Amino acid sequence: YNESLGDIKRMQVAVSQCHFLQLIIKVSDSKKILEVGTFTGLSALSMSLALPDDGSLITLDKNSKTNKIATDFFKKAKQEKKIKTIIKPAMESIEILKKENNYFDIVFIDADKDNYKNYYDSSLEMIKKNGLLIIDNVLWHGEVADKENNEKFTKIIRDFNSYVKDDKRTKQIILPLGDGLTICSKL
């Protein structure tokens, strides 16, 4: 299927990241996950497969076309009972989830980079103590290391990485899997 995506297939998480997410879910005994950014559902499906039978995953995305692709994959893998999709801008969905007093063991962020800081701060409020916030694309093809590179998204990710590094609410590490994952543990 990925070959049919053309240039946008680069938005897909790497297989190594899927394996890592599954490992983290299993060793942490996580049961409730929020994903910000569904795309075609690879990461959501990978995480759902690692959840126990009573686990659940909510995934947020505003794109109904890619959401249809994702939900078709969820059904084929018999995971549709564990996965709930919400189709609207992620910040709107996050605010609703907060008002409903939802809490999560893990939040995985892989969505529009302009809102990474907003997603991070809002999601952190819904993570249980010692819960994990995992963010994708933090190495941004290695471009964040080039201080001379001031391309819009490179700068956004570089500034986001600095913000997270200085955040006293979490303990964090960057792993060079795929396009880079930041793993934050809520203190």
How would you name each of these model-derived features?
Residues 1-108, 113-134, 138-187:
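A short alpha-helical cap/connector motif
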